[in-house]
Amino acid sequence: MEAMSPQQDALGAQPGRSSSLTGMSRIAGGPGTKKKMKTLAERRRSAPSLILDKALQKRPSTRDSHSASIDTCAFLSSFMCSSRTLLIDGPVELKRGLQRQERHLFLFNDLFVSAKIKYNNNFKIKNKIRLTDMWTASCVEEVGEGNMNAQKSFVLGWPTVNFVATFSSPEQKDKWLSLLQRYIALEKEKDYPKSIPLKIFAKDIGNCAYFKTITVMNSDTASEVINMSLQMLGITGSERDYQLWVNSGKEAAPYPLIGHEYPYGIKMSHLRDTALLTQGSRDSASPSQLQEPFLMEQLPREMQCQFILKPTRLATAQQLSDSSQKTFKRRRSIINWAFWRGSSTHLDNLPMSPTSPMPGQLFGVSLPDLCENDNLPKPILDMLSFLNQKGPLTKGIFRQSANMKSCRELKEKLNSGIEVHLDCESIFVIASVLKDFLRNIPESIFSSDLYDHWVCVMDQGNDEEKINIIQRLLDQLPRANVVFLRYLFGVLHNIEQHSLSNQMTAFNLAVCIAPSILWPPASSSPELENEFTKKVSLLIQFLIENCCRVFGEEIASLLGELSERSDREHTPDITCFQMNDSSYDSLENELNEEADAPCSDLVKKLGQGSRSMDSVLTLSDYDLEQPEVEGLLTLSNFDLDQSKEEHIPIKPPLEPKPVNVFVGYRKVSLGEHARAPAGPGTLSCLPVAAADAPKVLRRHRRSSEPSIDYLDTKLSYLREFYQKKLRKSSCDAVLSRKDEDYLKQTQPQKKGDKVCLKQSSVTGTDVSKRNTANENIKKKSLSGHEGTQVTLFTKSKPVPISVASYSHGSSQDHPRKQAFDADPCRFSPPHLTDAQKSSRVQHRRCSEPSIDDQNYKLSYLRGIYSMKQNKASCEAGLLHGEDDYLRRHKSLQIEGQKLINQSLVMGIEVGKSSSSHQSTEKVLPPRLNLCPRASYSSLSSPGSSPSGSSVSSQDSAFSQISEHSVFTPTETSSPIDCTFQTQRKQEELSSDFDSPSRLSGMPGPSMGQASSHLAYLRKGTTEQPSQMHSVTLHPSAWLRSGLVTLKNWSLKKKTKAARPEDRKVCSLKEPLELPSCASGTPEADSLQESQDDLQGDEGPGQTACGFSSYACQDSEQHAGSPFHLAESRLKPCMKLYKGEESGGQYPCDNPWEGASSSLETTEDTANPGAEPTTFAMTGTDI
């Protein structure tokens, strides 16, 4: 088959073409078609999406793919010639520092090629090096960083780089290494010339020549060249004390040689590149083309190559520092792809290690060389002074990490000799730079040669032996090291003394700083390093705790002098502020800005956890002229109805009314008491701006605005500015002397107004009770015009006033318990509503804890606080008054029981006198339509009912239940739990009856319907008449039956559960029919027997109904009934009881019952001679 052109091949890939046009089937051209379509699709796509997809895709590993799967024929054809053969090829990982590169290597007999595998299985050439310029070595750890397998790796390099080559297996590694060493040696034999002159420049070496020219062979390594250079320069020493550097025009920075490289190959590679550029691109340059290889100085700067000899300690620092300037390609992280902007030089020029020391005058130099006459350099003294001054008040000093960029910039400034103002730097940055300085001291400040001796110190017996050994080891150190250690451990000891505030104990400090003070001389296993690190930490901890015994007692005075000298050197014109980059709060760091401020002693006394943001004592408008600190208590939580930007002026009231002084107070911790200034009243030392400030109360501080502490005494010229910006400080309101005098004058008025408020509240209660009763009567009268059906609306609820209290009321319900009506928004009079609104602001909110004002020094708040102390501690007041309340409650129960007994006796007497004048009539019970609603009662007995609510009777204490009425009890009630009410209007329900009926002999002062439970009465109940008979009871017999009933009810309640269905059936099957009797005691005996039978059959749930079965179901009677006589007799008793009730106000059960103490109904009668009667009974707990 004929070969197709690329255009025909592309056409064959199109789906619409037939096989006749392409000359081949689609199936045959399938794989190639997919491959080319993928390439075209990638070209059409936008560059960002293609880069993102490639970055997110899994990068194929060259180790997993076999070389046979990649077509290498086309790639190798460009290198193959008659004299070149391929020895081996395969995947490898090249590592340089922290960079990893996956490459595919090709080894020819005279050439080494490194290529990168592309996604379409093609190769891209990365390096092509002659074997004569290459070298190999086994120093893996000196080239690469991190975990490396030495069994699978070796060092492979060429001018002027070194890589760690890692292969798939040790066998592959050995095979590659042997082939490289063999053919490198063979190619070096072909070099011409065998030797070349090499100029060596000496730098940082005193008393020697500037440079020397030596002759090197093509097989000489860098270590051998160093030995020859030392002899030529007349320098005594070992080759380990010096290092050879290469300054190539190809690289931006000098490159250090480890020792196994070939300087001959490095220089010849530069000459060959020059020859290739001048003579043309040829595979190699013949020796004839290099007739003048010694005229390197005549070449351009970028083609030159110089070798520099430096001492090892400076060379080590230069190696790590210049690596930051050395350009090398760095793979971008896909995580930061959104920040790829502009040039990539800031990524490609990053140092290999961010903590690498910078060469110069300070870092990487031994202390004896830095210290002149055993005096520390000024930058080191400044840092120690700053840490000694600010470190004790800084939380997490030496532990909190700092910004690496700030650390690097500060190190560069210090290393270059530039004067640095440490006040402008973060204390965490200074602490980090100091640790970096310790890490860069050659062989550590404790000397790595004495490492084993230092580690064994903690294995000794007692502290005296340890101190003696430590002092002997210190004598072996250079004098400059000991001087620095004295200052350093003095600072650490001072920080440890304030560990309660900075949370840095001796152990925490030792853990943070021990790795920078001492480390082992050589690398060891991780297990041994961890064990040694622990021992070194214990040693440093012991030194911090016993530094005065080790270094002498004068170390404390040394630190004091140091702090004073540092304060004198720092002039007050330095006004630089820099926000701390640490994670700690900025306010806490602002408190640490000036340790010599008058409040420093106050801040130092703070304990752990007492410097939280909500407990910082704010200091505003600090007066430089006053010797004492003026602290203003933060006033917050003003009237929430006012906006934040609105000013609230204080004006004298025009008329006597409660004065609302909005004072926000909260629970004061012990730490805040310690912060409170101990000076006299603060009003005497307020500045002028603060004296004028009380004219207008300040707005609330926003949550985003920090509290500003003006503790810096050096910012005197900013005082006027910050006085204008006083609203941004945390002092939200300031009161002046005028306000203090005014508050003292209004205090007696407030006391009198409170008494008036209580009286008006009582008066408002009576008015609200009348309004409530009248409104209920009106609503009930409206419902009487609907015929025989009486509908009770759910909204028209009687408002009871009960004295029963729920003893477990929470403090949150306390303000609501002091209300006097059930619905204050609807029934309260205007003056009571205003009083409640004014007092509502003064109540402590539920979220605010109670406080006890012990250390408040503001004299103008004492009177206000003493008046509000009982409200702030309402929970404690309830607990103290609980016993007194129980005693008063019991006494009221006894009095209420007596009144009930008296009223019952009086009712019985009235019944006896009127029983002879009444006749029995048939009454048709009305069809009631009762909506289910909660019952109301004046006899609240939480102890007797399961739900805490009591049983009430709205119209009468006793009523008759019809034979066909459905009565569904919902809860068990007490047989005595009943309520007496007066008669209602005669006209309200007169249309519901065929003829008026009068019953006599009932033991109660009023007639009504008993609704002791929630009941559902059917509308469609068949109306049938029932025989009603008049019964006369003797008082003693009635009371005896009541006591027996009460005992039976209390016993049966505990043993027998209420069964609503059974009681319902009993009420249907057993209508209440009592025989008619004339008069006298037999009726009482028969009534007592019938009551006992009812109690035994129906249980306690129906006992109350048995008492009420003798009354007419109609709740409305004529005004001329004999019960008005009983009401007239009870009036004096009720008036007397009302006086007792008004004298003792008690909290209520809940917010709905808390506004009433007894059920009170005002009724109008048709009789002109009868006047409206107010009848109240107090419920008791029996």
Swiss-Prot record:
The modification Phosphoserine is found at S46, S704, S730. Residues 758-772 have a biased composition (Polar residues). The keyword Mitochondrion does not apply. One of its GO terms (biological process) is regulation of Rho protein signal transduction. Residues 365-551 form the Rho-GAP domain. InterPro entries: ARHGAP20-like_RhoGAP, ARHGAP20_PH, ARHGAP20_RA, PH-like_dom_sf, PH_domain, RA_dom, Rho_GTPase_activation_prot, RhoGAP_dom. Keywords: GTPase activation, Phosphoprotein. GO terms for molecular function: GTPase activator activity. The keyword Acyltransferase does not apply. The record marks R399 as: Arginine finger. Residues 1-40, 745-772, 803-839, 935-955, 982-1011, 1074-1101, 1142-1182 are annotated as: Disordered. Residues 811-824 have a biased composition (Basic and acidic residues). GTPase activator for the Rho-type GTPases by converting them to an inactive GDP-bound state. This is Rho GTPase-activating protein 20.
